[in-house]
Amino acid sequence: MNTRISALAAALLIALAAPAMSADVPQGTIKGKAWVQTDRTMAEAMAQSWTVLPASVTGDRTYEGINIRAPETKGKAPAVIFVHGSGGINPQIKAFQKRLADELVIASFTADSFQLPDRMTYTSPIDPMDYEKIHALRASELTAAVEFLAKQPWFNGRFVIAGTSEGAVAVARYVRAEAAPAEAGRIIFSWSCENNYHVVQHKTRIPDGMPVLNIMSSKDKYFSQANPYLGNHEAVGNCSKALQGNPNARIVLIKDAPHTLMNEPEAREAEDKFLKDVLLK
């Protein structure tokens, strides 16, 4: 009798506690039903990619605009392929690309995933399998972007792949196709390469010895313990575990930085050193 009462009491306490424990966890939502690019929409994602070409490439001034309207080029440059996050090509990404061209003489482009009509969008958290649909979409776009870059008349053969948040998952998981050019390095912004709510498994696939720069906020609102629905009590909030043993990996933690941080002063300093080492030497 006492055992039964204790069990019932424990169950009641758990039931009463459950709402309080989940009070800070929002209810995620999904809009849109498309998560696979067709040949046509993939071509549009590349044609409409935000492209920034240095003045040395155009022979005039820095070009900022969609790829399909880029001017005839007269020079070549190394490149950064950037994979945007869930919010698309935002002003911070455009500013990052502009700085690459003006200060480092590096070309760049960001394919536009939202050329896919009725593309799936979400507010977190949602089911991990639904996130994986988006990750598969973004992986296909990165593979296509590498193929697209190889055909650009201004491309000098050296490039880095970079991405932020949702887009950084694709960068961390990227596996080069046999016929594709090999990247010189990877930059992972605001993704921790860990198991958490955003993936079924993190599935990081970075080759041993690949130069990698991981830049994170010390308290990223999505991928650190600051997130009440992170889903991994052992997560450290950066890629240090996944990159353990890679002598060419660097982790930069920026205290109290926002989730979108590629233009923070400490981030810029780290980006410059990394890109000069892997692309400009």
Question: What is each residue range found by the language model?
Answer:
Residues 1-8:
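Bacterial N-terminal signal peptides that target proteins for export
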Residues 9-17:
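Bacterial N-terminal signal peptides
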Residues 20-23:
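Boundary at the C-terminal end of the N-terminal hydrophobic targeting segment
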Residues 45-154:
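Serine-hydrolase catalytic machinery in alpha/beta-hydrolase-like enzymes
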Residues 87, 113-117, 193, 220, ...:
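Alpha/beta-hydrolase active-site loop signature
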Residues 145-206:
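Primarily recognizes the serine-hydrolase "nucleophile elbow" in alpha/beta-hydrolase
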Residues 185-253:
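The feature captures the conserved acid-bearing segment of alpha/beta-hydrolase catalytic domains
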Residues 244-281:
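C-terminal catalytic histidine-bearing segment of alpha/beta-hydrolase fold enzymes
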